[in-house]
């Protein structure tokens, strides 16, 4: 029973403003041009979610013992057809380089998601030799955003980008992305605007007795009134109970929501580490 519970939990372990300042432009095998800094910033973080806790045969169809799990988070959506374990390298604190045994974007692979890749393999040990860097070393491509997303993207080859923003095993989850969504992407049954948020690792309710549908009351959205942030509590939450790291927050206000926060000690990751207070700006594409 414990193995089944752990497998259920691990499944969930799972804007494009151009800079006005003159910078070197990079034509990185993509449609359009981005600066080197903009391409680098596409890789937001990696989250050392579980250490030697995941069965390799079940998740990777290989007999390799118990594996580490590390969600890697991107600002732009990824092209699943370009995804491969050989796209990634993980550097540990002793200088060893690890290639994942397998990778997956499931279950966060619905339209409007596709921003988190779960790496499975051996990436070091939490206390004595933690992972310190994640590198994209193969041809991993982003995709254009689709109708209903407030952010924009283009097709970019991410090969060569890295991050040292590795959240340690003992730390709790935090928000890494938010955007406004509408049309077919919107799963809210009520309200006037919907904000999609994404966590850097999988989450479940931390407070005893809470279900995922109760989490809306701990989120706060903010509108901007002449530089003053006005708080708004969502009236409900959608895109839940699907074992991924995305939520949709349903607001009744017509004032544009520009920031989202989450109260501390309300959700936890699969390692049972609770969140601290977290906030994120709502991303949008400026023409």
Please place each PLM-identified region on the residue numbering.
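C-terminal motif of bacterial Sec signal peptides marking the signal peptidase cleavage site
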Residues: 12-15
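Sec-dependent signal peptide recognition
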Residues: 2-10
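Residue-level detector of intrinsically disordered/flexible regions characterized by low predicted structural confidence
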Residues: 4, 19-20
């Amino acid at each position: 029973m414990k193995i089944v519970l752990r497998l259920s939990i691990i499944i969930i372990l799972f804007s494009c403003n151009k800079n006005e300042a003159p910078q070197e432009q990079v034509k990185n095998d993509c449609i359009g041009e981005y600066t080197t800094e903009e391409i680098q910033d596409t890789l937001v973080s990696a989250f050392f979610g579980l250490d030697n806790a995941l069965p390799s045969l079940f998740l990777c169809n290989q007999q390799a013992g118990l594996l580490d799990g590390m969600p890697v988070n991107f600002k732009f959506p990824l092209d699943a057809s370009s995804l491969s374990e050989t796209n990634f390298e993980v550097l540990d604190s002793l200088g060893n380089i690890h290639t994942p045994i397998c990778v997956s974007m499931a279950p966060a692979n619905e339209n409007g998601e596709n921003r988190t890749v779960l790496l499975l393999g051996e990436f070091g040990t939490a206390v004595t030799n933690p992972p310190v860097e994640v590198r994209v070393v193969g041809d991993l491509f982003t995709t254009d955003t689709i109708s209903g997303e407030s952010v924009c993207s283009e097709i970019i080859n991410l090969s060569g980008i890295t991050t040292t923003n590795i959240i340690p095993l003992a730390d709790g989850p935090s928000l890494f992305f938010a955007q406004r969504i509408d049309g077919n992407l919107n799963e809210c049954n009520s309200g006037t605007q919907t904000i999609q948020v994404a966590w850097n690792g999988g989450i479940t309710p931390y407070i005893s007795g809470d279900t995922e549908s109760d989490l809306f009351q701990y989120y706060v959205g903010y509108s901007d009134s002449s530089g003053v942030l006005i708080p708004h509590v969502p009236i409900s939450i959608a895109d839940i109970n699907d074992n991924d790291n995305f939520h949709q927050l349903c607001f009744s206000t017509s004032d544009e929501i520009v920031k989202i926060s989450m109260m501390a000690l309300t959700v936890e990751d699969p390692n049972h580490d609770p969140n601290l207070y977290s906030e994120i700006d709502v991303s949008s594409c400026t023409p």
